[in-house]
Amino acid sequence: MESNVVYKGESLELCEDFIDIGYMAENVEVTDSKGELKEIKRSHPDKSMTLLISFPHGQEGFIDEILKIDELLHHIQVDIHCYMIFDGSFEEQSVIKNRLKKFEVVLDTEDEFGSMYGTKLVSGSLENKLTKSLFLISKDGAVFYLEMPSDLEKQFDLERLRIELNKAYASYTGVGCHG
């Protein structure tokens, strides 16, 4: 995983720790739209998947991309917990929250997502913001698919996300590796 990303020609550095495909995802504490702490769990009793997506902010070109992703996931017919994560100082939360159908908007006020998933930017004009990232966590709590563009202006590959969602859903048997 690269430790640098680019946004509008500026090189930005990511924190050193990161989580990769195949690793067990981490539970993280965030703040919901009511200002209450909430734990995002890596796995759920109903065996649903989890999708964690972060952006540095919800302005400019990012809002259009956020709405496209939300529209795609709104039409997915399997249970999936979807979280749109921004840093703790994000102020446009209610504007975005009111436009989303599938995602719950949360803030990384405890700095757990940024630090544990390696999405925290530690230099440049977006210092202490979250980089653009997408983590698909399978039903068993492992990171199944990860996309973290090295150029923040590059959009997520939604066709690939659709394929990975299907693979993650179909590949889980519920019996473990010794079953």
Task: Show the residue positions of the predicted features.
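Chalcogenol-based redox active-site neighborhoods
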Residues: 1-179
